[in-house]
From Swiss-Prot:
Highest taxon listed in the record's lineage: Bacteria
Name of the protein: Large ribosomal subunit protein bL12
Family: Belongs to the bacterial ribosomal protein bL12 family.
NCBIfam families on file: L12 (TIGR00855)
Gene3D superfamilies tied to this protein: 3.30.1390.10, Single helix bin
Underlying gene: rplL
Amino acid sequence: MAFDKDTIIASLKEASITDLSDLVKAIEDEFGVSAAAPVAAAGAAGGDAAGAKDSFDVEMTESGDAKVKAIKAVREITGLGLKDAKGLVDNVPSVIKEGVSEDEANDIKEKLEAVGAVVTLK
């Protein structure tokens, strides 16, 4: 099947957001794919796997259903303003805090999981 890429792009530019959202869902259903961004695999960088890790990055991979509570928790943990905290929660996966000790990382993880977020430590 031949198609003109420029014609399709022009048609998409004219479509409403609702129509585009419906189109994405239909494509996902038809082809069994997801429009979600892929998450990088942990541990791909190598390094000393047997050694104890000194610092951890706390990454929120899912914000959960209670986004307002997640935003409040992120603000409390990071000291960020409302807009920045909301940006982290809305754009998961996102690193909440970098280079923290294991104890602090686990405390942050517990706080975020308590409000329904899914968190990984890297």
